[in-house]
Amino acid sequence: MADNEIKILSAGAPKTGVARCAEAFTKKTGIPVVYEFATAPVLKETVGAGECDADIVVAPVAVAEAFEAGGHTVAGSGAIVGSVKAAVTIKNGAMEPDLSTAETLKQAILSADSVVYNEASSGQYIASMIEKMGITEAIAGKVTITKTGSAVMQHLDASSLTNEIGFGQATEIQVQIDKGMNVKLLGTLPQEVEKISTYKSALLTGSAGNQAAKNLLDFMASEEGQQIYKATGLI
């Protein structure tokens, strides 16, 4: 990393907004910003172990607050980035399940030939939802758990099945669609089981004296930064 370079370590769901904010900041200031994306469990492990060389971290609120409580981020430096809804994705041309209620979603999961979600925090919620529906054992033989959110869409894209259902963050699904992946954002989860994940940025303690990083955080929290995030699907 260059001496004047700012590094962001972020969860995957807000990745497009984080990247575009970073690019806009660089355009304004000339200061280069690099970014890396990881799942929330990896963020916890990396930052918690003191092995993170980034200046700024963007994580789910609960994770970000744990970082602050553990002294890994500067107290009071955080700001809400935005929120993302969990959603359903399928391959283009596949059967389209009814997402109108929790019960129709449950039946869609039971009748699907394959169910795909990730091991990150968003996927952990899906596993919990399925457990609360009482169908974990019934579908155990047809579940695929991927490492990342993007891997869910990659799996669907490569699949020959016509009745397969995947889950992920709406923003991540849209990123893959924009890249040309042959998948569809079918819709968000029904209201009864809706999942909204909120993300927060913060300054890592090792960069407490990095004024440029502080300025980037301020930009991310500004009206201009928030408009950039909203334009990428964050709410």
What does each of the following model-derived ranges do?
Residues M1-E36, P41-G48, D55, V61-G70, ...:
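Exported/periplasmic ABC-transporter solute-binding proteins
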